[in-house]
Amino acid sequence: MLKTRVIPCLDVKDGRVVKGVQFLALRDAGDPVEAAKAYDAAGADELCFLDITASHEARGILLDVVQRTAEACFMPLTVGGGVRSVEDIRALLLAGADKVSINTAAVNNPDFVAEAAEKFGNQCIVVAIDAKRVSGPGEAPRWEIFTHGGRRATGLDAITFARTVTARGAGELLVTSMDRDGMRSGYDLGLTRAIADAVSVPVIASGGVGGLDDLVAGVAEGHASAVLAASIFHFGEATVAQAKAHMAAAGLAMRLDP
């Protein structure tokens, strides 16, 4: 049975972590490599870096961060944000990323997913789906894809889009509820479950974790294969080990460190 993965997420801007990370062992909370080393030591199954830098000039800084992290850490590393071309993907993989997350470029051109999967293999192509609930009270639930940090509506149905990019070769989907992100009220389980049940690839639940029970629900009720969280780990409210122990106690298959 496949183990459920716990994935901390670091937002990186101009080579620095944006959300504070309150690890006591960290000399510099703003350094993503130090944060990554701490999560690696804490037993995270994977780590996700999302580069939210607007400028293309900062790509060199991100590549340096990825390279230094890959040299220092054993856990798999997924990197996303601003990936627009096959060259971007190649550069990140060469720097040491294990997987690359594509967002806006996949929305603009789903065939880009096929091209990337053909060149680098399905296993390292993740499509990030940012969605908002657009159905009203009493209506059948419906979610729309948004880009540009949730600011730009696309008119695309999230479930249909998930099927499209999976058919094009995406090996994994990172599903974030824009409604729940940062709200600490739990994942949008309806969204996560609808997508997970519609595709044959692993789905990572993202957006809205406020406590450890939310992680359990993401898998047990949301049918996710992995759970991503930021704030509860960054602000020291729970450790990765506590999260895994809590999920294992709820009957989920976890990779527990001895």
From Swiss-Prot:
It comes from Methylobacterium sp. (strain 4-46). This is Imidazole glycerol phosphate synthase subunit HisF. It catalyses: 5-[(5-phospho-1-deoxy-D-ribulos-1-ylimino)methylamino]-1-(5-phospho-beta-D-ribosyl)imidazole-4-carboxamide + L-glutamine = D-erythro-1-(imidazol-4-yl)glycerol 3-phosphate + 5-amino-1-(5-phospho-beta-D-ribosyl)imidazole-4-carboxamide + L-glutamate + H(+). Disulfide bonds: none annotated. InterPro entries: Aldolase_TIM, His_biosynth, HisF, IGPS_HisA/HisF, RibuloseP-bd_barrel. HAMAP family: HisF. Belongs to the HisA/HisF family. GO terms for biological process: L-histidine biosynthetic process. One of its GO terms (cellular component) is cytoplasm. GO terms for molecular function: imidazoleglycerol-phosphate synthase activity; lyase activity.
